[in-house]
UniProtKB/Swiss-Prot annotation:
UniProt lineage: Eukaryota, Metazoa, Chordata, Craniata, Vertebrata
Gene: rbm47
Biased composition (Low complexity): 1-25
Tagged with keyword Repeat: yes
SUPFAM superfamilies listed in its UniProt record: RNA-binding domain, RBD
Subunit structure: Homodimer. May interact with MAVS; may regulate MAVS lysosomal degradation.
Family: Belongs to the RRM RBM47 family.
Listed name of the protein: RNA-binding protein 47
SMART domains named among the record's database cross-references: RRM
Record has Phosphoprotein as a keyword: no
Length: 600
């Protein structure tokens, strides 16, 4: 919104001298003609009263109702940084309630309330103040203001976006050629920003950013350059709003002692950067972090950082002309939202920072960090746009709406805004993968959905060892995991050998006389865990496979025959829990199988 737009809005709201009259005291009285958009409104009388009190005009156009500018205002509209975004407005709240709240912190230049066809608001508005400090005060004091009982307003900074992203540009085109071509088809072009390819500095990255003199000029250019209408150099182009640069508080920027270096050669090492930036004061560089063709240089003091920036900006390092600026801090909450949107996940990201409340953004125009190829910017593959805390302009010219399916209030290309990787170097988690920890033990699923951990029963040990069993701790190596859980289970039972007790225990275990339901499935190997234990009678010999191996030399093993010598226990591994009562008496205790054989 420009001053010219506001002036025309006032003219529309006061179309003729007859629309207002003067009282005997000489003060204007706006009561003869009600502006379009106010007439027929649910609170028409309250809006007219507000206009009479303040002297501001009001008109509705392009889906928004504009209140302002102040009477007698001359000159251009307030500079960037004077506008705020107001969200979470109840749909039946209008200017007569909003204006008194927001004019309490400063002089309002203009308020734009987004309206629906049914006469209700769309839940958000933009308020522009005459001074930057008034807008900052509004964000600080009116965020979470209770406009109605239990209804809180959301207030944050808004950015007057004047920059467009244009993709599909031939990579051989220079900045001057792009500026000339774009100026032929659009008006109000101020500058063109082009970045060299990371691999070949003689080529561009296939896209550029065009800066316009006003938001209105940028909006008109965007409408004219929409895909399918105009081709540049015979190529189909992609046009959208560029992500506006975040306005960082001046007090915060005065504390920054980290430099952002852009347009480096990929081969340039961190050591070369350390030497180059540390030449003005040896030892002043604390850390260098290089990511593809850009880097962050940390200094011990801000003065050293400023000296290096002033001397090295625009110079060449290994044949490439570099750009050096102070790194802009980004609020941690906003950074987390950037991460969630860019990664396509709702999981929160833990952020660490060297300063109390900020992490540092890197090149707002590179796709290097996120790793998206350029073709994701064109056509239907534009699903990674970020959702920032700053809010773009309303529907005036830009036709921007609330959060759409792309999850962005800005509706524009993020252009790969990366965040300094020092604060998010977490690697992608590998998918969980099960491993067999017994190489020759087959676990068969008896349920088409999944394996439910079964149980196995050990006779007469429940009272003797009530708490002896515990889950095996996880092992780091897969090969260790194949052996360690079983050893962990056996060790608590490693009692001194007692032949008499062993024989008595063996006598308790009855022979299996009925055919098992899994006959024909060889169970191998089966181990006898203690010597002097009688084998199951020959009637059940068919249950053993050819790999049966009695272990008779271990003097420290206890009476663990029921664990793996008995066929019923082996049957439990196959999921046939119904077969277990045939081999075990009632005096048993239960132990989950997954505590013995875990998968990792």
């Amino acid at each position: 919104m420009t001053a010219e737009d506001s002036a025309s809005a006032v003219a529309m709201s006061n179309p003729s001298p007859s629309s207002s009259s003067k009282s005997s005291s000489g003060h204007p009285q706006h009561h003869c003609t009600v502006p379009e958009g106010v007439a027929g409104a649910p609170n028409e009388a309250a809006l007219v009263s507000l206009m009479e009190r303040s002297g501001y005009g009001m008109v509705q156009e392009n889906g928004q109702r504009k209140y302002g500018p102040p009477p007698g205002w001359q000159g251009t509209s307030p500079p960037r940084g004077c506008e705020i975004f107001v969200g979470k407005i109840p749909r039946d709240v209008y200017e007569d309630e909003l204006v008194p709240v927001f004019e309490s912190v400063g002089r309002i230049y203009e308020m734009r309330l987004m309206m629906d066809f049914d006469g209700k608001n769309r839940g958000y508005a933009f308020v522009m103040y005459t001074q930057k400090h008034e807008a900052k005060r509004a964000v600080r004091e009116l965020n979470n203001f209770e406009i109605r009982p239990g209804r809180l307003l959301g207030v944050c900074s808004s950015v007057d976006n004047c920059r467009l992203f244009i993709g599909g540009i031939p990579k051989t085109k220079k900045r001057e050629e792009i500026l000339e071509e774009v100026s032929k088809v659009t008006e109000g072009v101020l500058d063109v920003i082009v970045y060299a390819s990371a691999a070949d500095k003689m080529k561009n990255r296939g896209f550029a950013f065009v800066e316009y003199e006003s938001h209105r000029a940028a909006a008109m250019a965007r409408r004219k350059l929409m895909p399918g209408r105009i081709q540049l150099w015979g190529h189909q182009i992609a046009v959208d709003w560029a992500e506006p640069e975040i306005d960082v508080d001046e007090d915060v920027m005065e504390t920054v002692k980290i430099l952002y270096v852009r347009n480096l050669m990929i081969e340039t090492s961190e050591e070369i950067l350390r030497q180059t930036f540390g030449q003005f004061n040896p030892g002043c560089v604390e850390r260098v972090k290089k990511i593809r063709d850009y880097a962050f240089v940390h200094f011990a003091s801000r003065d050293d950082a400023v000296v290096a920036m002033d001397n090295l900006n625009g110079t060449e390092i290994e044949g490439s002309r570099i750009e050096v600026t102070l790194a802009k801090p980004v609020d941690k909450e906003q950074y987390t939202r950037y991460q969630k949107a860019s990664k396509g996940t709702a999981a929160a990201t833990t952020v660490e920072s060297t300063q109390q409340s900020y992490v540092y953004q890197c090149d707002p125009y590179t796709l290097a960090y996120y790793g998206y190829p350029y073709n994701t910017l064109i056509g239907p593959n534009r699903d990674y746009f970020i959702k920032g805390t700053v809010r773009g302009r309303g529907r005036a010219g830009a036709s921007s709406r609330g959060p759409g399916p792309r999850g962005s209030y800005l509706g524009g290309y993020s252009a790969g805004r990366g965040i300094y990787s020092r604060y998010h170097e977490g690697k992608t988690k590998l998918p969980d993968k099960p491993y067999e920890i017994m190489s020759n033990l087959e676990l068969a699923a008896v349920n088409p959905v999944g394996i439910k951990p079964g149980t196995m029963a050990l006779p007469a040990l429940g009272a003797q060892y009530p708490t002896v069993f515990s889950a095996a701790p996880a092992t780091k190596l897969m090969e260790e995991g194949k052996i360690h859980p079983v050893e962990h289970l056996i060790n608590p039972l490693a009692l001194q050998h007692d032949p008499t007790a062993a024989s008595a225990t063996a006598a308790v275990i009855p022979a299996v006389s009925t055919p098992p339901p899994f006959q024909g499935r060889p169970i191998t190997p089966v181990y006898a865990m203690a010597h002097n234990i009688q084998r199951i009678p020959a009637a059940a010999a068919s249950l053993y496979g050819a790999g049966y191996m009695p272990i008779a030399a271990h003097a420290n093993t206890a009476t663990l025959a029921a664990l793996q010598k008995n066929a019923a226990v082996a049957a439990a591994y196959g999921g046939y829990a119904g077969y277990m009562p045939q081999a075990f008496p009632a005096a048993t205790f239960q132990m989950p199988i997954h505590d013995v054989y875990q998968t990792y």
